[in-house]
UniProtKB/Swiss-Prot annotation:
SMART domains: MoCF_biosynth. Belongs to the CinA family. This is Putative competence-damage inducible protein. The gene is cinA. It holds the Pfam family CinA_KH. Signal peptide: none annotated. InterPro entries: CinA (IPR050101), CinA-like_C (IPR036653), CinA_C (IPR008136), CinA_KH (IPR041424), Competence-induced_CinA (IPR008135), MoaB/Mog-like_dom_sf (IPR036425), MoaB/Mog_dom (IPR001453). It comes from the Bacteria.
Amino acid sequence: MASAEIIAVGTELLLGQIVNSNAAFISQELAADGIYVYHHTVVGDNPERLKEVIKIAENRSDILIFTGGLGPTEDDITKQILADHLNKRLVEDEFHMNKITEYFTSRSRKMTENNKLQAVIIEDSVVLNNDYGFAAGMYLKANKHTYILLPGPPSEMKPMFTSYANPLLVSENGEKIILESKIMRFFGIGESQLAADLNDLILNQVNPTLATYAGDNEVVVRITATASTKEKAAALVKDMEEEILRRDGTFLYGYGEVSLPEHVTAMLLERKMTIAAAESFTAGLFQAEIARFPGISSIFKGGMVTYSEEVKQSMLQVPAEVIEEHGVVSSECAKVMAENVRRLCDTDIGISFTGVAGPDSLEGHPAGTIWIGLSVKGNESEAFQYVYGRDRNHNRRRAVKQGFQLIKHFLETNK
């Protein structure tokens, strides 16, 4: 099976001025073709270093895909360096030269000589038309390798790759190998624990492959299988998925690119269950998160941010004796907050967040101590305690996610 390497050319990438989104796009497209990308390389606009990168890539990859360095300026060196490396001439492509000339003529503007460089290609290349710019792309086979040269701007690179380069790659790589992937998302279990639970599967993986990633207060598992047909690849993925679920299915919250808040919001919308929130240390973060999703106005009636004790009493009607006897960082306060916001907003669900964001302690509780209250109409109110670390904003984000998880658990166990 052919292997590919993506070489992004541009000093601006090394300086972090531009994010290399091209590599992610090309990798996803090639994965669907059954072509493995084993290396992403970024090199600046330096001839000697680019020559070195080309030699290294040829020793480990069948297909070399270049992005960037095809423009009209002196630092656009990709095709010149590759042409020298392959002992090939640079020649003019008539189509792109006419396109550039017509552009300047139609606007009564003088065309500088350097603009012609965009229409120059390496001899023996298949020209890849640039439908959204001037720099010609190239598809070239030499020395038992395939070289693809694409422009740097994503608005030009993506359509060129999709319309011209990728079809050539697929047609020349024989029978298409089908790649099937599935993303599983877990919350409430750390990456190290999940990896330990799946250790034998990870160590013995062949096909499908299995990988775990730490996300934002969650763990992502990716299963990838290859086969001659989509059905066979999907079956391999399914077998692995079922084994993972058998071991840690209680922590699974969803699949693909759907986040935990989005998944829970969809459940609430489907059941037409209304919700309100009372927030202290999260300061409206839960409400801001749930408000991101379309259609939320039909179920999210509103909420309150009651940071101080005085506002908890005056707006949320938390009895002074609850605060005096138990403190604001307590099960009792969390439950009253959830109950009262549900009552005041007349909703099915009320959720509350109170705790110590950090880094300092409060009421004798260390940073990261939080309580989440949950009040559901017709059910006894509950409060759940968690103890995180000292990172203030991490604690706030994690608490909000935990709140969504608690709602999810209730909905799943009370269908």
